[in-house]
């Protein structure tokens, strides 16, 4: 297969023991119905309730790398026949050398935007011989984007809500052309950080509270409910109009955090944001029904009402990281 960096990699025809050193690769494996083959994964995966429900063994998976550094002994102990890694790891000379020395095939799967996500899902489809399943999912993704974009395209710029997106930490936010900025734009919204030209080397950037006051967004959307609660409770955030108007929302969490740079479900975030900010234009969109059908069709899971409520509230589907820092 050819990975996202254009490397030609010979992979086992039917890889049975896979280590996912990038959380999103584990989520894509679940999408392709191959999650039972994961023998090691990033610790975030073990906190994802949907992964654990579908594949109970995930809860106890070891993480054979720490802070981006591969532990060769731990990798070998898991006897993997394939490693899935993120670009950042490959670009570190010492880590790449370690991977090469292991002699286990590794595929780089990573993304920064929608096109990158499409490519990542296609590459994973090829790795596991599930090209058709990957393509069906991508078609669904594109259909949802088009559905929303068509309905909001005539909203004048001046009438589009300006939103600030808090990614895991209150002052970590979107950069230009990132996956989350694309999600927010598709939903007919203005992303105050990305649209002000904010850039950084990674997938997001840290800003100051002063900067957020300068933007004074109409609404704030948060990836963690703990951050939503924090922003609403903190005196220093209370001068923002979004806080005064209680326009601070927690984003849903399903198989992945829908509006996160590691999301494999950006179309679901677009639907949620469209329904939240343009209820009149999306009166016929039943999010609960959509969620029910979507997880049945693409993840083979029959969700009960309680789980759908948790997904849409962003509460109870993922254990917060203990390192959740607040500004």
PLM features per residue range, with description:
Residues 1-13, 327:
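Short, low-complexity disordered leader/linker segments with a strong preference
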Residues 4-6, 61-73, 197-209:
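Short helix-initiation/N-cap motifs at beta->coil->alpha
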Residues 8, 93-172, 201-204, 250-325:
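Extracytoplasmic substrate-binding proteins
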Residues 19-22, 39-42, 82-86, 105-110, ...:
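Structural recognition of the beta-strand scaffold that forms the well-ordered cores
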Residues 20-78, 82-89, 189-192:
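A short, structured surface patch at a secondary-structure boundary
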Residues 24-27, 44-47, 82-83, 88-91, ...:
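Solvent-exposed loop/turn segments at secondary-structure junctions
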Residues 78, 194-250:
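A contiguous binding-surface segment within folded domains or other stable secondary-structure elements
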Residues 176-203:
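Alpha-helical, coiled-coil/dimerization segments enriched in small aliphatic residues
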């Amino acid at each position: 297969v050819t990975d996202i960096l254009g490397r030609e990699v010979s992979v086992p025809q039917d890889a049975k023991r896979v280590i996912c050193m990038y959380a999103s690769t584990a989520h894509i494996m679940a999408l392709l119905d191959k999650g039972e083959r994961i023998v090691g994964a990033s610790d975030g995966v073990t906190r994802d309730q949907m992964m654990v429900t579908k594949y109970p063994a995930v809860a106890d998976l070891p993480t054979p790398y720490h802070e981006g550094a591969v532990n060769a002994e731990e990798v070998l102990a898991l006897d993997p026949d394939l490693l899935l890694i993120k670009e950042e790891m490959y670009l570190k000379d010492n880590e790449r050398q370690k991977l090469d020395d292991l002699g286990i095939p590794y595929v780089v799967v990573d993304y920064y935007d929608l096109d990158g996500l499409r490519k990542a899902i296609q590459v994973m489809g090829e790795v596991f011989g599930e090209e058709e399943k990957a393509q069906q999912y991508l078609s669904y993704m594109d259909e949802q984007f088009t559905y929303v974009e068509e309905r909001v395209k005539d909203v004048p710029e001046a009438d589009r809500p300006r939103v600030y997106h808090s990614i895991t930490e209150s002052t970590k936010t979107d950069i230009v052309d990132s996956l989350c900025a694309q999600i927010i734009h598709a939903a007919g919204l203005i992303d105050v950080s990305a649209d002000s030209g904010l850039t950084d080397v990674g997938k997001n950037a840290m800003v100051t509270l002063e900067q957020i006051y300068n933007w004074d967004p109409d609404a704030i959307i948060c990836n963690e409910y703990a951050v939503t609660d924090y922003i609403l409770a903190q005196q220093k955030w209370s001068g923002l109009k979004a806080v005064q108007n209680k326009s601070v929302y927690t984003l849903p969490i399903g198989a992945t955090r829908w509006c996160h740079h590691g999301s494999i479900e950006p179309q679901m975030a677009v639907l949620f944001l469209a329904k939240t900010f343009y209820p009149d234009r999306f009166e016929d969109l039943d999010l609960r029904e959509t969620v029910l059908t979507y997880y049945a069709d693409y993840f083979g899971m029959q969700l009960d009402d309680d789980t759908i409520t948790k997904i849409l509230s962003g509460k109870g589907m993922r254990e917060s990281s203990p390192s959740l820092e607040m500004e």
